[in-house]
Amino acid sequence: WRDVALYALAVGAGRNDLMYTYEKYLKALPTYGTIPYWGTVNVRPYQWMPLPASMLADEIIKPTISFLNMDHEIIMYRPIDPIKGTFQYQDVITDVYDRGEGKGAVVKTRIDVRDEAGNMVCTNYSTTFFHEAGGFGGKPMPKSDVVIPDREPDFELDDYISPVQNLLYRLTG
């Protein structure tokens, strides 16, 4: 339960969020399911399919290269047990885009997370930008269909980030 509570504090749980921080009736935040993704970024996945062998994935994913998470989607299928359990996960690179020499590369991945019984817990989809990795001759990044409207936002939210929150997050591993 300690890891689940520490994670909740690290992402901003406060005094009104006892269901995520107090062990008596503890629940795991759904975003706790993103942890398998962060455990595999910059790590060579064991399964490269469905990429063709011609892709130079070894040149893109290197532990010395910094990266930027461009987007992340998590689909939850069941709650995460906050007390005990083991994740089994499969990380698949679904696409690699070459932005050109000096412009980086973009890698799209899917991670299926299962519990010990093999039941799906969640699926993570992400897009990661590796700024030092472009120019390998891969397919170009498709243009975005997103249109940003020229108007005021629907709503705005001011939030507080504790001065120690970054330390708590790093302590989660």
Outline where the language-model segments fall.
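HotDog/MaoC-like acyl-thioester-processing domains
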Residues: 69-157
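Residue-identity detector for glutamine
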Residues: 47, 88-90, 165
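Hydrophobic, proline/glycine-rich low-complexity stretches
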Residues: 1-86
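Catalytic strand-loop segment that frames the active site of acyl-thioester-processing enzymes
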Residues: 1-35, 116-117, 128-173
